[in-house]
Curated annotation (Swiss-Prot):
Extra remark: Interacts with the polymerase and the uvsX and uvsY proteins.
Single Gene Ontology MF annotation: DNA binding
Protein name: Single-stranded DNA-binding protein
Assembly and binders: Homodimer in the absence of DNA, monomer when binding DNA.
InterPro entries: NA-bd_OB-fold, Phage_T4_Gp32_ssDNA-bd_sf
Role: Binds preferentially to single-stranded DNA and therefore, destabilizes double-stranded DNA. It is involved in DNA replication, repair and recombination. Binds ss-DNA as the replication fork advances and stimulates the replisome processivity and accuracy.
An example Gene Ontology biological process: DNA repair
Phylogenetic placement of the source organism: Viruses, Duplodnaviria, Heunggongvirae, Uroviricota, Caudoviricetes
């Protein structure tokens, strides 16, 4: 079903993947983070849209 076209192409792709040591970016600007108060407590408001 899946046939490998070239072993050199496969080796190049594997080397490209092996060079990526970082994985996923740990700094995501869109990610929501809970802010804690001085006592270490956090709160969130859950809103259900109509």
């Amino acid at each position: 079903m899946f046939k490998r076209k070239s072993t050199a192409e496969l080796a190049a792709q594997m080397a490209k993947l092996a060079g990526n040591k970082g994985g996923f970016s740990s700094e995501d600007k869109g990610e929501w983070k809970l802010k804690l108060d001085n006592a270490g407590n956090g709160q969130a408001v859950i809103r259900f849209l109509p």
